[in-house]
């Protein structure tokens, strides 16, 4: 059950990252927002490669004490990530204000929170 919760959370994050390309999320990132959109898009995509490789390696590694700690860290990140997006939206950036974008972000956070509870208890 715990693995399924984590897989849904991470899959929701991956879907959000696809949506983030459409929303030009690189404009929110300190270094990339200084680049022209075409270059920033390429960097945004390329910089996600090691993150996705790490997530897939984590999943492929199977259960262990170390992977559970890392999963917990990913869970915390997803919860904080949702809060950051809410904070950005509250400041007036409406890029992720669509109900679908918000749903993806909060779906990841919700399943991460449930999974984190599963890990802790």
What is the role of each PLM region?
Residues 64-68, 83-100, 120-121:
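Membrane-helix boundary connector in multi-pass membrane proteins
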Residues 33-51, 101:
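A loop-to-helix transmembrane entry motif
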Residues 113-121:
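Juxtamembrane boundary at the C-terminal end of a transmembrane helix
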Residues 7-24:
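N-terminal signal-anchor/start-transfer transmembrane helix
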């Amino acid at each position: 059950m715990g693995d399924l919760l984590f897989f849904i959370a991470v899959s929701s994050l991956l879907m959000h990252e696809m949506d983030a390309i459409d929303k030009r999320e690189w404009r929110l990132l300190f270094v990339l927002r200084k680049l022209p959109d075409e270059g920033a898009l390429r960097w945004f995509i390329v910089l996600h490669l090691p993150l996705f490789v790490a997530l897939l390696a984590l999943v492929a590694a199977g259960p262990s004490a170390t992977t559970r700690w890392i999963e917990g860290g990913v869970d915390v990140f997803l919860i904080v990530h949702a809060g950051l997006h809410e904070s950005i939206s509250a400041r007036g950036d409406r890029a992720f204000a669509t109900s679908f974008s918000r749903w993806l972000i909060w779906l990841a956070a919700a399943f991460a929170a449930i999974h984190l509870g599963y890990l802790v208890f």
